Amino acid sequence: TVVVTISSLSASAETSLLFIGNSFTYAYGSAAKFYRADSVTDLNNEGIGGVPALFKSFADQAGLDYDVYLETRGGSGLDFHLENKLGVIGRRPWDRVVMHGFSTLDSSNPNNPAVLIDTTAQMSNFLQELNPDVEVFLTATWSRADLVYQSDSPWNGTPIEQMAIDVRAGYDAAA
C-alpha cells in the first residue's frame, strides 16, 4: 500500500505591497495599462497591470518576493479612495503601500495641497490601524501639458516645470 500525502504550501510572498492611485498608476492610454495584469492582484477586478505590474517584474528580476496589489480609479484623488474604497483596501493588513492623489493636488482647487495633506494623513492612519508597521510611500505625479497651457489653469503662462515644482511641494507638505 502506498500512501500519498499532499500538503498545502503557502504561496504568498514575503511582503505585500498595495498601490493606491489613478490613471497615473496604470498608465491610461498606453499598453502598460494591461501589462502583465496576471502578475498582480487588481482589487477592483478591472484587469489592470500598469506600474504595479512593472514593479512586480523588476522585483522578480531582482529576486525580491512581493505580492503586488492595486486599487485604482481614474481621475480620482485619495479622497475618493477614502470615501469609497476603504472596505476593499481594509480587507487585509499591508506591509507597504505606495499611493498618490490627483494630478493637480485637488481636482476642485488646482495647486492647493490641503486636500492631499488631509487625505494622506487619513489614509496613513487607516493603514496603520491595519498594520502598525506598514511603510507608506507617497509618490508625486508629474506635469500635465494640457493643464499648463489652458487659460483657466493656475499654471497658465508658466514653464511646464513650474507645475512639477508646485506638485512636488504639495507632496512634500503631505509627507
Provide a role label for each language-model segment:
Residues V2-V4:
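C-terminal edge beta-strand
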Residues A11-T15:
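Boundary at the C-terminal end of the N-terminal hydrophobic targeting segment
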Residues S16-L18, V97:
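Conserved beta-strand elements of the Class I
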Residues G21-Y26:
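Short polar catalytic/cofactor-binding loops
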Residues A27-T120:
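Conserved SGNH/GDSL esterase-like catalytic core that processes O-acyl groups on lipids
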Residues L86-A175:
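Alpha-helical cap/lid subdomain in secreted, periplasmic
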